[in-house]
Amino acid sequence: MARQTRQRILDASLSMFNTQGEPNVTTNHIADELEISPGNLYYHFRNKDDIIEQFFGGYEQRMDAALTAPSGRLPELEDVWLQLHLVFECIWDYRFLYRDLVDILSRNRRLRMRFARILKRADEQAHKVMRGLAQAGIMRASAPEVDAAATNILVIATFWLNYAAARGDKDERASIRDGIVQVMMLIAPFLRDAERVHLNTLTRAYLD
């Protein structure tokens, strides 16, 4: 029973954080939503940051898996697309972390350090994939262009939801889809003609 209550708290908290924004949700709101006493909630979690750290652990596992590139061969466009899809799916499921990123990290040093590690790994992976595409002959780009493209990919992926919210987008799933396409379009100018046609085909299939 206690385990079920703990999971119900996590499920309700994640839904409320994602839909209402983490700063707007208190532990009392969560307890009211579940029709349990605040004391019952505190039996399982010391405070709201304790709940957030539980989510961050799941986010880290998902993101680490998404950032794992194919081994033993050079990347292809499909690899980039799949990796972006997994990354943006993770961002969608834990979107409150990104939408309220500055507020959450400003008050929790542990999460700030852990998020910095994720960003560092994502940066390294983006550079590795871009260099792999260039090495495979899929991209024609100088070393500075490859590095700039990798950095731009990371910036857009990290802050796309914030940008979409600022411009008033209501459909966050569509915003995620648009973010993936936007990232892929950063690569398009550097692709060979045949690969650019292939990318356009992938994009149309994804948007349909």
Residue ranges and their predicted role:
Residues 162, 166-208:
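C-terminal peripheral helix-coil segments that are non-catalytic and often amphipathic
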Residues 68-93:
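Hydrophobic alpha-helical connector segments
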Residues 5, 9-12, 149:
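N-terminal positioning helix adjacent to the helix-turn-helix/winged-helix DNA-binding module
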Residues 110-136, 147-162, 178-189:
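Amphipathic alpha-helical packing segments from all-alpha helical-bundle domains
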Residues 8, 16-54:
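Helix-turn-helix
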Residues 99-101, 113-114, 142, 199-200:
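Short, hydrophobic secondary-structure boundary micro-motifs
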Residues 57-63:
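Short, basic, alpha-helical segments at the C-terminal edge of helix-turn-helix-like DNA-binding modules
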Residues 67-70, 98-105, 133, 137, ...:
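Secondary-structure edge/capping motif, primarily at the C-terminal ends of alpha-helices
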